């Protein structure tokens, strides 16, 4: 009897599909049933081959060998996951298999994952496509009952290949050209470089900003009411001090007459469900977690604990087929402190409204929500518990009714001038009950602060005991932190110098710079290549980053290039543009970029040369600020030697409670704090032992130190193999 091979993107999804299809027999990298064989990728198993696979001369980076423009790009198996590729290959080549079902993520990249495997195996069997937005049993059953012909997604596949090949031609050539021309590792790309440019532009805005003093007026009444002056346009600030001085002087000995009391009943609805970017932003703001760290925590909650849904999503909505599962999800997450909240929601039928249920706004995956799986808090780390708390509270909040309140605005006249006061009375706590009414709102639009208003009637006269001038200064734009940088990457249109509204709209609709799955890696790569650095929570551009922007072609610095690409990739996906035409344009563009870099007369200057020499080649070492501390790296990119000088740890200073920096090597290592505190590593170990009641031993300390160096979870992507070979100067 003939069977169908189902290719899922990850083992966890494969297990869900196999369970529904009754594939119980376990094999080496697959699950088999009477009709189906379910196997899986691990992200990408196949990628574009390295330059040296076309010509051995490309093993060495030489400017004269550029541009590298192979007529046809080849595929290669990623070594890291070659075993699983062979497992998938063996199932595809089975004689009893007559059909392939692509069940990877429903989107451009998911299509590429499966099709590259099929192309590399060189198998020609009929293809069908499972296109679902969630992996519930019902969604899987419905999807298999409505499989689409594979050819319906040929254009989507062509679009995905076009994107990958364009990144190969431009990214690898531009990086090699910059690196060899200026003898410094200067990697660039259509996402990385505009991101660095946005950070540089923000720093320029801050540098060029000139603070202005503004003035206002506040009146205080004998019944402790504070009234704020407003002009005819509703502004409570003025840059004209003489005007404000004159008003204050003219109001002496005037009382306030209540002219109007405006009562409005208002509603505010819960913020939307989390997508990955929004979750990364909140985790950074509340806990200081990096985007990469939040993604890694989410992966564990998704794959290991199975309590949250797929993390790499760009949707803040769920699809209608998920609504029926909400009661079970509420029962699963409704434990501990969440029990009374979940119980309250379950008392009434759940209404699926457009604020969180919208099929049209779910593409590859729905928003991050709890699963129906059992929750065991004792198995969570502290960080996992915090991220889980964010997601569950947001999930509960959207299912609660609106926050309702009555806003009272008091309008008074003092002389001929208008003064107002504002207060709020809560009618129904609604979703804010989930946050114990401590949710931070961002809806403050003026300088009028809400206060408790006394009982007042229209026409009342209020005795004014004090009229005073207030003042403040305009503030420069804030530096980016990881939370705000993620927002800027998601919506870079306000940083674009373009009059092309359609281009800006396309960039916005296609998700901005990078994707939810890649932004954390991109930010991490910018730190690791020393183009940007952290000072506290703020992100600063380095001298190297500044020089990179000065050396790269102008077009690579703007998000516009990504917008133009996305327009054309969208046209390919719709069958309106041939992939070959786009790639031909990219090859010509690559020639222009390489030519511009070759003819540049600019110089790259290392302004961070230390007094240390490289132990391998003897050349000067450069001092750089890595993401987690200071490092020394060899100036010669061919050598690539690097060593840690110091790194920020999770150990806290016993005096000021800030994170300690670990400096030095071996037995001479010492913890240091900005407040001046110093402590040898050996003394630190003794203190830790005493604080833990003499229960700590060497293994505890080693485990602690190992945690500081723990590497992030590897993620297969099309350029993983190519990029890992890069040496950073």
Curated annotation (Swiss-Prot):
Mg(2+) binds at residues 9, 105. Keywords: DNA-binding, Isomerase, Magnesium, Metal-binding, Topoisomerase. Residues 3-136 form the Toprim domain. The active site is at 310 (o-(5'-phospho-dna)-tyrosine intermediate). It comes from the Bacteria. The record marks 61, 168, 176, 312 as: Interaction with DNA. Residues 686-713 have a biased composition (Basic and acidic residues). The keyword Magnesium applies. Transmembrane segments: none annotated. It is an enzyme of class 5 (isomerase). GO terms for biological process: DNA recombination; DNA repair; DNA topological change. Residues 187-192 are annotated as: Interaction with DNA. Pfam families: Topoisom_bac (PF01131), Toprim (PF01751). This is DNA topoisomerase 3. Gene3D superfamilies: 3.40.50.140, Topoisomerase I, domain 2 (1.10.460.10), Topoisomerase I, domain 3 (2.70.20.10), Topoisomerase I, domain 4 (1.10.290.10). GO terms for cellular component: cytoplasmic replication fork. Its cofactor is Mg(2+). Residues 153-594 form the Topo IA-type catalytic domain. The gene is topB. It catalyses: ATP-independent breakage of single-stranded DNA, followed by passage and rejoining. InterPro entries: Topo_IA, Topo_IA_2, Topo_IA_AS, Topo_IA_cen, Topo_IA_cen_sub1, Topo_IA_cen_sub2, Topo_IA_cen_sub3, Topo_IA_core_domain. Its EC number is 5.6.2.1. Residues 686-718 are annotated as: Disordered. Belongs to the type IA topoisomerase family. GO terms for molecular function: DNA binding; DNA topoisomerase type I (single strand cut, ATP-independent) activity; magnesium ion binding.
